[in-house]
């Protein structure tokens, strides 16, 4: 079964950064990565996931429309077995 990491972020550069960071794992076929640019697209992908095992969801917190914090309970309700990591590029100022 194919293992999938789903990354949810509205910034287009994120896909390039993640693919570069995990290039060895991706080339070795340890898992695949898919990218959703919004919460609704991520929820659709989660609902349609057949023949793959989602092993991790990483979501940006700050996105237009549905924020990552709004996505979190919906994704957990759909897939309570999948860990979700919230990420952000913004610091807390300290």
How should each PLM-predicted stretch be described?
Residues 2, 30, 52-55, 78-83:
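His-Asp phosphorelay/catalytic-motif detector in bacterial-type signaling
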Residues 44-47, 69-81:
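Short amphipathic alpha-helix used as the core "switch/output" element in two-component signaling
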Residues 19, 35-56:
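Acidic, metal-coordinating helix/loop segments flanking the phosphotransfer/catalytic sites
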Residues 12-34:
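Two-component/phosphorelay signaling modules centered on CheY-like receiver
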Residues 61-63:
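Receiver (REC) domain active-site loop signature in two-component systems and cognate sites
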Residues 90-94:
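Negatively charged, flexible loop motifs adjacent to catalytic sites
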Residues 37, 65-66, 79:
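Hydrophobic residue at a beta-alpha junction
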């Amino acid at each position: 079964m194919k293992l999938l990491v789903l990354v949810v972020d509205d910034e287009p550069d994120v896909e390039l950064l993640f693919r570069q960071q995990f290039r060895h794992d991706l080339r070795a076929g340890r898992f695949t990565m898919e990218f959703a640019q919004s919460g609704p697209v991520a929820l659709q992908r989660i609902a349609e996931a057949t023949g793959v095992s989602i092993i991790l969801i990483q979501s940006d917190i700050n996105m237009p429309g549905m924020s990552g914090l709004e996505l979190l309970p919906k994704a957990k309700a759909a897939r309570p077995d999948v860990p979700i990591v919230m990420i952000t590029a913004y610091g807390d100022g300290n």
